[in-house]
Amino acid sequence: MLENRVKTKQIFIGGVAIGGDAPISTQSMTFSKTADIESTKNQIDRLKLAGADLVRVAVSNEKDALALKELKKVSPLPLIADIHFHYKFALIAAQSVDAIRINPGNIGSKDKIKAVVDACKEKNIPIRIGVNAGSLEKRFDQKYGPTPKGMVESALYNAKLLEDLDFTDFKISLKASDVMRTIEAYRMLRPLVIYPFHLGVTEAGNLFSSSIKSAMALGGLLMEGIGDTMRVSITGELENEIKVARAILRHSGRLKEGINWISCPTCGRIEANLVDMASKVEKRLSHIKTPLDISVMGCVVNALGEAKHADMAIAFGNRSGLIIKEGKVIHKLAEKDLFETFVIEVENLAKEREKSLKD
């Protein structure tokens, strides 16, 4: 059951609203050296094209921090500076970026946090309190270990620090590398604060592993109404982080956009290379943002029944196939004409739906 979203305080990262009634945003992180502006800009461009709303960049040294001024000028996405250990890099970064992420486990003393807060106040930019189970402050780690309780106590302590400094433009993340600790931590903290949540499973692994962990943890939280922005962390291509994140948003009921793909798992009746064809169809129609149910079936035997609830379906037969629109066969074509005709029909249907929504 899809629950209503928890209403949180709204903050802004550049022009992107986080929390309140704002759509749930997606983000990723570049892996280039931030001071290499050309490479970093290219990666940000890729993320923009993939549909990302925000981007985070590592600030590992003073050179990275100083490069942010020029990077900000060319970035098509709001920039978040990721700071570990060296609070002075945050002071430099705050002059140029749209938000600062700090790890309370390694940023340092209250005085250092105050300096970061003062810099963010001056530029009117928000902070993310980025709690990680693997790098909790010593006192919380010794008392609780890398547990949900330890993460929550760290978040509450640091939220209170910022509040005492009269600073409330912040969001919170509670990241662990497994599903259960991630879910439990966010559930535990949600009723205790009004601030927006950044969701994520940290160090989640490769595309396969991360997709499963993230779908279970983030998808479950999203269905409970928890979460305002998110990152799917993948050891792999940048674009996959956004692709998987947006799929999780769609299938958790939080994003009404794009195609819901339906395809049979294959059996002895298939009369085409369905694996290749399904991949080809999905890639060719990936640009469509209109909500549609599209079915790709490996034989005509089951297609008429199984695809009847799809907006559009393609069924491959022996050197021929069917195109089915809203349960009715509209084309029976030779194999050579089937694919391109199907693409045209789906694109036309998307245009029809968009027009009807505007009218």
Swiss-Prot record:
Signal peptide: none annotated. One of its GO terms (molecular function) is 4-hydroxy-3-methylbut-2-en-1-yl diphosphate synthase activity (ferredoxin). Keywords: 4Fe-4S, Iron, Iron-sulfur, Isoprene biosynthesis, Metal-binding, Oxidoreductase. Transmembrane segments: none annotated. Its cofactor is [4Fe-4S] cluster. Binds 1 [4Fe-4S] cluster. InterPro entries: Dihydropteroate_synth-like_sf, Enolase-like_C_sf, IspG_bac, IspG_bac-typ, NO2/SO3_Rdtase_4Fe4S_sf. GO terms for biological process: isopentenyl diphosphate biosynthetic process, methylerythritol 4-phosphate pathway; terpenoid biosynthetic process. [4Fe-4S] cluster binds at C264, C267, C299, E306. SUPFAM superfamilies: Enolase C-terminal domain-like (SSF51604), Nitrite and sulphite reductase 4Fe-4S domain-like (SSF56014). It catalyses: (2E)-4-hydroxy-3-methylbut-2-enyl diphosphate + oxidized [flavodoxin] + H2O + 2 H(+) = 2-C-methyl-D-erythritol 2,4-cyclic diphosphate + reduced [flavodoxin]. Its EC number is 1.17.7.3. Pathway: Isoprenoid biosynthesis; isopentenyl diphosphate biosynthesis via DXP pathway; isopentenyl diphosphate from 1-deoxy-D-xylulose 5-phosphate: step 5/6. Belongs to the IspG family. Converts 2C-methyl-D-erythritol 2,4-cyclodiphosphate (ME-2,4cPP) into 1-hydroxy-2-methyl-2-(E)-butenyl 4-diphosphate. NCBIfam families: ispG_gcpE (TIGR00612), PRK00366.1 (NF001540). This is 4-hydroxy-3-methylbut-2-en-1-yl diphosphate synthase (flavodoxin). The gene is ispG.
